[in-house]
Design a protein with these regions (language model features):
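Mobile, glycine- and charge-enriched loop segments
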Residues: 36-79
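Extended substrate/RNA-proximal surfaces in nucleic-acid metabolism proteins
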Residues: 32
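Active-site-proximal loop/helix of nucleotide/amide-processing enzymes and allied scaffolds
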Residues: 1-26, 35, 58-62, 76-159
């Protein structure tokens, strides 16, 4: 079973993840990133949305989906992404691997500098919690594009 989550806060501002929906129809090849992205697209209809949304996929050590959550939304010029929620979701869902996915509503497959910045920040969050980063992807009507991880700073050696 695969769950779709959101983060809720109680009266003391303590976070917990809440199950929005549960899906029993996991993808046939649940360890293939491509089949997982197509599965996410079928559940969220990402490629047809008129606005941009950012999702996190949580995986176990065998790279099977544990769950997913929307962590940001916006339009082409600006997207509000809540990195606090990303960290909480990864920790509270028990993620051992994670993937970040977003859509481009204007059917643009090329990555922007903001997409590269998102990929870098997500990689930093994964490194902080010792979670393997499975990549960053863009879903559009034209197809799926992977954003290369590139060369990022190793913050442990910067003084």
């Amino acid at each position: 079973m695969i769950n779709e989550y959101n983060v809720l806060y109680d009266v003391n501002d303590i976070p917990k993840i809440n199950v929005l929906r549960s899906y029993k129809d996991a993808p046939k090849d649940n360890t293939s990133i491509l089949s997982q992205l197509k599965y996410l697209e079928s559940k969220t209809n990402l490629k047809d949305l008129a606005y941009e949304q950012v999702y996190i996929l949580s995986h176990n050590i065998n790279q099977r989906i544990k769950g997913f959550m929307c962590v940001g939304s916006g339009d082409y010029d600006h997207c509000d992404i809540f990195f606090r929620n990303i960290g909480m979701f990864l920790l509270l869902s028990g993620a051992e691997m994670a993937t970040i996915v977003h859509n481009h509503p204007e059917d643009v497959r090329e990555q922007s500098t903001d997409d590269e910045d998102l990929t870098q920040k997500f990689s930093t969050v994964c490194d902080m919690f010792n979670i393997k980063n499975c990549g960053s992807y863009i879903i559009s009507r034209s197809g799926i594009t992977q954003i290369p991880l590139g060369v990022f700073y190793d913050w442990r050696f910067i003084k």
